[in-house]
């Protein structure tokens, strides 16, 4: 296997690799939108990544069998500049996924560090277990898991005495201690997510007012006991 720089001329092949992985994921989760893996969607994003950020590819038997790129974010998950590789920014043929991702990160991770990125994060489709394992072997941990389900009623009731309602701006004073408590909790072992400063009422208010954002609170009597946003 040969590891080389990912170039613009490789990106249509890269889209095909991601589409193949996404099709396998859709077999397990059919409600996923098939258009998420279309070349029309993925190709412009990959082109944008390569305009200012590095990428690598792996070639075997005369064809590209894997690729990986990403983009940089200042103060990413803390005070340091970081690199983020989303689920469409990497893919590999399943037969060699562990080894190809290990080789790609060995090459690309060094480029990221050379560019001043000290925090590295990678998104995976759940199907790509061998790729995930390669990063676990390199010392990565899990910080977030997203789940997808059909939009339909859930047959469940709140416990007796518990009321669940959308959070209003008038609830921010009760909400703020829960947010801060959660942030302090994940800053401790074993997560160690950096805790820089408490979120402010103004920040939470801005979040609630942003179109498309939703947040819910569970109340036990007059006490706020849980939230989801």
Predicted feature residues:
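Conserved donor-binding loop and adjoining core beta-sheet/short helix segment
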Residues: 15, 21-103, 219-229
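ER/Golgi luminal nucleotide-sugar-dependent glycosyltransferases, focusing on the catalytic module
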Residues: 201-205, 214, 219-220
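A short beta-loop-alpha structural element at the N-terminal edge
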Residues: 1-16, 22-27, 163-178, 183-187
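Acidic, serine/threonine- and glycine-rich low-complexity intrinsically disordered segments
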Residues: 167, 176, 184-202, 206-209
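Acyl-donor-binding surface of acyltransferase catalytic domains
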Residues: 72-75, 85-161
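A generic secondary-structure signal
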Residues: 45, 107-111, 206
